[in-house]
Amino acid sequence: MGIDRRRNVIIIGAGNPGMALADYRGFNDSGFRIAALIDVDPAKIGRSSRSGIPVLSFSDLKRIVREQHVEIGIIAVTADAAQNVYDALVEAGLNAILNFAPVQLRTHSQVKLKSVDLRINLESLSFYLQGVEDGAS
């Protein structure tokens, strides 16, 4: 199933969503190691998440992916920055990417992309609740 060994993960975006993902303990319990947080904001670079994961510069992405043996990238940036981040992750050699940005990305055929759209998921739950409220199940 692909979860029989540890995999190194990198998170792009050290804002609130990225920091929350970096500090989520369930990743480590499931065999995923967050190797680094990456950001373009000089005010964030050099800081760490609450769990001690360093925020490194986006300009060092390729080197970090190579040195940390990163296999999976997580996009936790704004919608307007997401495509550039996706392209940079692919250029750095990643073939598996999880996208939290609320935008549909132009993808490469050799790359597996999974997107998490919180708005769509909330709309789905709201639709379900409306059915319950209307007497359907």
What are these language model-derived features?
Residues 1-7:
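Solvent-exposed, charged amphipathic helical/linker segments at domain boundaries
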Residues 7-102:
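A solvent-exposed beta-alpha-beta segment
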Residues 101-135:
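Rossmann-fold NAD(P)-binding glycine/threonine-rich loop
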